[in-house]
């Protein structure tokens, strides 16, 4: 072993085991915190945990579960476990008493082993319950028993139905038993931010990159779509997301990528006439906000066709899915997408005019 390789190995081990030690310490700290909190509860009051830590589209899709769990445990103190970067999606939810910013799955595993929570609803399965630094997966026995994993989950319904099954809230392949329309809890601060942007009266929001490349549509085709929209419609085009990969110079185009929080983005989408995007987090914001959506989709792994949405998008009441059976999103031609977008804009205009 070379000296450089030796140094790399021990640097890796140092950071790994320092991380694991911190996870253990934070778990014990959280256990003491919840133990003290529980000691102040009224007799019979339960401490309930809901676990959906990422990604933000999944958290939005799972929002109806918070209301359903509250209906099952009206007097309980309900805590939602989430990655700190997504806490704002939970902070303002009136069905949740506390947002817990999770350090990593090891912290959660140790905390739950202390049995301070009376009931845990895990909305995750092992494949998306992972800490790269600890190099461990955290299994969900309920999901394992039902055969729900990253290779099968869309065989069990939309995301809301899948998460409800992984928590044993519903039986396999059964509809969600309560209101399945996701909600957002936007505050004045989010509305004020949107006001400060001085958005045009009529605009379309676009989102061009997901967190998973196989769901994406090529940037060059997005540029063509923006040009076509600008030449044929009076709408302004507003792009949202983390970072733009477009090169368009259209005067009607505005880039807001990287400038907004999740809920500020949601408010911008809510004000739009249309949302054109991918199967990604912002499309779930559009569903929850009630904005008509045009969603570019394709086959995904073992799923040649799937529907991740519940509520109005799931029923395609105000959503148009742009896809071709068996083709990946990247394989959709620009002409095909333009045709479907034109049909959706026309259909929606006719519906609004009735």
What is each stretch, according to the model?
Residues 1-354:
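Catalytic machinery of carbohydrate-active enzymes
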